[in-house]
Amino acid sequence: MTMNSFERRNKIIQLVNEQGTVLVQDLAGVFAASEATIRADLRFLEQKGVVTRFHGGAAKIMSGNSETETQEVGFKERFQLASAPKNRIAQAAVKMIHEGMTDPTHVIWTQA
């Protein structure tokens, strides 16, 4: 999918609005662009006040107008955020866990 920066940034805005968060790695795959290009796009969009960046991605800016937006992020949202890296961590960790060992974290829970 070949796009100019204007088209790509508009599509990124659309994805952020639909999904709430996006990851650099995922966007690079979607747009067949380098991660450096996507990071530059996210920096540009953050400077314009459209998104807020976090390590590895960007999120929709909450208006603070609704009660749900001002609440702390819940388990479901944390679970979905950066799920691919969490799955890779869990797959590595599961090799170190033996019968009878337990760990209450949600990273390990993904392997259940």
UniProtKB/Swiss-Prot annotation:
Residues annotated to bind DNA: 22-41
GO molecular function, one term: DNA-binding transcription factor activity
SMART domains given in the database record: HTH_DEOR
PROSITE patterns: HTH_DEOR_1, HTH_DEOR_2
Coiled-coil stretches: none
Superkingdom per UniProt: Bacteria
DNA-binding keyword on record: yes
Keyword tags: DNA-binding, Repressor, Transcription, Transcription regulation
UniProt-listed SUPFAM superfamilies: Winged helix' DNA-binding domain
One Pfam assignment: HTH_DeoR
InterPro entries, alphabetized: Carb_Metab_HTH_regulators, DeoR_HTH, Tscrpt_reg_HTH_DeoR_CS, WH-like_DNA-bd_sf, WH_DNA-bd_sf
Keyword Transcription regulation: yes
Residue ranges occupied by any HTH deoR-type domain in the UniProt entry: 5-60
Function as written in the Swiss-Prot or TrEMBL entry: Repressor of the gat operon for galacticol transport and metabolism. In K12 strains the operon is constitutively expressed because this gene is inactive.
PANTHER family per the UniProt record, alphabetical: AGA OPERON TRANSCRIPTIONAL REPRESSOR-RELATED (PTHR30363:SF44), HTH-TYPE TRANSCRIPTIONAL REGULATOR SRLR-RELATED (PTHR30363)
Protein name: Putative galactitol utilization operon repressor
